[in-house]
Amino acid sequence: MTATLSLKPAATVRGLRKSYGTKEVLQGIDLTINCGEVTALIGRSGSGKSTILRVLAGLSKEHSGSVEISGNPAVAFQEPRLLPWKTVLDNVTFGLNRTDISWSEAQERASALLAEVKLPDSDAAWPLTLSGGQAQRVSLARALISEPELLLLDEPFGALDALTRLTAQDLLLKTVNTRNLGVLLVTHDVSEAIALADHVLLLDDGAITHSLTVDIPGDRRTHPSFASYTAQLLEWLEITTPA
């Protein structure tokens, strides 16, 4: 879906294993997330999707295997997690993890990012006045302010209504193309995975059991092959659709 400007890896994982007590929740995971591409990770609840994301984000340290990340990754969750006592602008600058940038420069960068995510007049707004879609866009701006090469998304559109979800998905793709980001998208939504991802990985009981490269030109959702890609993923998930 994305126009790949570079095949530089944003993240490379080899032989990743992780256990909680005696239960091994990740069983030798291998994956590469390239800059300019979206990789979707699907699977049933408890399959290990969020655990992989937490490892890549540096939030889970005790594991074996090799994990190489280009720069500092950024994370956005299903819940925007905005601080209600800070303005929208200050919420975005809160995501800056660099000390070599002045406060005024940070504010300028945050304001520019809000314009980029289609919220140009919201600097002084308060989080509680925002719609769900607007809050999610602020969360995206906050994730981008440190100029990451790897963006980790954990069900980012799950709480949005259908129309707002489509708008947010299109914004994500434009952002990936403009910034040449590598993205790992954790989702339960098979249609979303096909609409957004260059590669889809199925995780089952801590292991990647299937992988799919999505090659659909133009508007994916209206393309005849969209249904066949979706059916393939549903078959892997052992989900039957009504006749």
Curated annotation (Swiss-Prot):
PROSITE patterns in alphabetical order: ABC_TRANSPORTER_1, ABC_TRANSPORTER_2, SSUB
Documented EC number(s): 7.6.2.14
InterPro entries, sorted: AAA+_ATPase, ABC_transporter-like_ATP-bd, ABC_transporter-like_CS, ABC_transporter_ATP-bind, P-loop_NTPase
Reactions catalysed according to its record: ATP + H2O + aliphatic sulfonate-[sulfonate-binding protein]Side 1 = ADP + phosphate + aliphatic sulfonateSide 2 + [sulfonate-binding protein]Side 1
Domain of life: Bacteria
Positions contributing to ATP binding: 43-50
Secretion signal span: none
SUPFAM superfamilies membership: P-loop containing nucleoside triphosphate hydrolases
Membrane topology term: Peripheral membrane protein
UniProt KW keywords: ATP-binding, Cell membrane, Membrane, Nucleotide-binding, Translocase, Transport
Boundaries of every ABC transporter domain copy: 11-230
Family statement: Belongs to the ABC transporter superfamily. Aliphatic sulfonates importer (TC 3.A.1.17.2) family.
Subunit comment: The complex is composed of two ATP-binding proteins (SsuB), two transmembrane proteins (SsuC) and a solute-binding protein (SsuA).
Function recorded in the entry: Part of the ABC transporter complex SsuABC involved in aliphatic sulfonates import. Responsible for energy coupling to the transport system. Is also involved in taurine transport. Seems to not be involved in long chain aliphatic sulfonates transport (chain length of eight carbon atoms or more).
Record's protein name: Aliphatic sulfonates import ATP-binding protein SsuB
The organism of origin for this protein: Corynebacterium glutamicum (strain ATCC 13032 / DSM 20300 / JCM 1318 / BCRC 11384 / CCUG 27702 / LMG 3730 / NBRC 12168 / NCIMB 10025 / NRRL B-2784 / 534)
Gene label: ssuB
